[in-house]
Amino acid sequence: MNANEVIANLALEHLGHDKGDYAVVHPNDHVNASQSTNDVYPSALRLALWEKSGQLQPQLTALRQSLEAKAEQFAGILKIGRTQLQDAVPMTLGQEFAAFASMLAADERRLAQAREELTEVNLGGTAIGTGINAPAGYAEQVCRRPVSYTHLRAHETPEH
């Protein structure tokens, strides 16, 4: 795996050793120890989605609050409501904006729930989800590491 070799060589340089001195830091034995693409890739995707979705949350809130403000501002403006591409019954423009705001409030709740579910990762499951070839306690320990740089409190999934 080329990425493991790059990481191993960067670690070697950082430690003051020559690139390729794999007796000190080996691409497979050290960098890739107890990992598999079947647990690392999905976990990395979950961590990335958790981080990026955190940027969406305040934007959704700001948009909802703007729509709520417009709902109040336009509470007295009458308009024709529409359904099935046809004119329907009268409503206020404020009611329409309030409906949009209500939908965004539901989206905010769903996003918060999805973000919570993204904290469950399958690191430590290794190739087939059993954790075979990983030392005891590895999954629990590796799930604690993202906290140091993302503030994410990841936890191991009960079923890999």
Explain the meaning of each model-derived region.
Residues 1-125, 129-130, 134-149:
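A helix-coil-helix interface module used to build multimeric assemblies
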Residues 150-159:
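Conserved small/polar residues in nucleotide/adenosyl-binding loops
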